Amino acid sequence: MAQFYSAKRRVTTREIITVTTDGLDAFGQGVARHHGKALFIAGLLPGERAEVVLSEDKKQFARGDVKKRLSESPERETPRCPHFGVCGGCQQQHASVALQQRSKAQALCRMMKREVDEVISGPAWGYRRRARLSLNFTPRKPGLQMGFRKAGSNDLVDVHRCPVLVPRLEALLPKLRDCLSSLDGVRHLGHVELVDVTSGPLMVLRHLKPLSAADREKLECFSHSEGVALYLAPQSDTLEHLNGEMPWYESDGLRLTFSPRDFIQVNDAVNQQMVARALEWLEIQPGERVLDLFCGMGNFTLPLARRAESVVGVEGVAALVEKGDYNAGLNALKNVTFFQHNLEEDVTRQPWAQQGFDKVLLDPARAGAAGVMQHIVKLKPRRVVYVSCNPATLMRDSETLLAAGYRTVRLAMLDMFPHTGHLESMALFERD
């Protein structure tokens, strides 16, 4: 959710106030009222009373730090992760999953001015199938640090456990740490990316200087013994495949291959449900043509092609368009065409834009889809499904559809990232 702030107003006094929170924002901050404005307090849950020290005071809102909690919510939980509160990855492990989902759904409801019809969720723990861990070596203790950044800082939190990772990746952490620590070039490592999909786990190791033959041999031994596909990244845009098959995952009975650097949804369980719900909402009929904008490598496009007469996918990243074409052939889908085009530019003269479509699906990045909304209206599709990772731009873009006579038929909150402040959603719009 987008928030816009002016320059900080320094608090010159360390006044202690006592407040009771009456809500939780989508980021997991407690919300109270102080002098008629919102007071945001990290770590405090709805209904909890606390002594708070103001850390920031502005015209429309303020922020405070808990000095002493005076009461405890029944929805407060003990965080599972020993790094919670320091690591910047999660913000809400202290709140029950039900409270997290309810607060996010309420935030979405306020922004869209409509009740949320459902919350689409999966396991709250062990859901994250992709992670990037920073690496830093110091000659003295602790030696190799491997982990995530602190909240609001570039400092590294040395992570030994991460309960939001899928179990196979979390179990890999200590063995991976031992392997990397043993390398002669350990001081020249940048980060390691871990991915776990249907084909198995993989790792991408970014190294800043060439690795010795001995180090490469150690990494290959680790790859074979742990069953982990291995890629090296000597440059930020270069990959060297040392071991293991090309990664792939299953979706809607299809096999989707991808490069380790390609975007895939982090939460497989919610992604599967999201695709199924989009197909259900669109109600594809025989003979219909469907347009999929911001299509990536075909996460929605290919399942749509199994049902529609024909599907067009449009994506700005050339590598993803190539992967979409490859996956269409791999799955023997001959009724789908992919186009590369920057959807932030004028689309009206593009070949695909001259065609007619019965239904449209779009899944833009956080910036939304302002550049194509008017063209979608001109196409006059009967139904539009908008998948969003930013409710602020969903709200903005939906105004174009509503002004053109569409109505919001369904609204769902996607709990894609439990225990974090990320709020994702999807909406169905229909034209009478």
From Swiss-Prot:
InterPro entries linked: 23S_rRNA_MeTrfase_RlmD (IPR001566), MeTrfase_TrmA_AS (IPR030390), MeTrfase_TrmA_CS (IPR030391), NA-bd_OB-fold (IPR012340), SAM-dependent_MTases_sf (IPR029063), TRAM_dom (IPR002792), U5_MeTrfase_fam (IPR010280)
GO biological process, one term: rRNA base methylation
Intrachain S-S bonds: none
Superkingdom assignment: Bacteria
Positions contributing to S-adenosyl-L-methionine binding: Q265, F294, N299, E315, N342, D363
GO molecular function, one term: RNA binding
TRAM domain location: 10-68
Keyword Transmembrane helix assigned: no
Function: Catalyzes the formation of 5-methyl-uridine at position 1939 (m5U1939) in 23S rRNA.
Name of the protein in its database record: 23S rRNA (uracil(1939)-C(5))-methyltransferase RlmD
Gene expressing this chain: rlmD
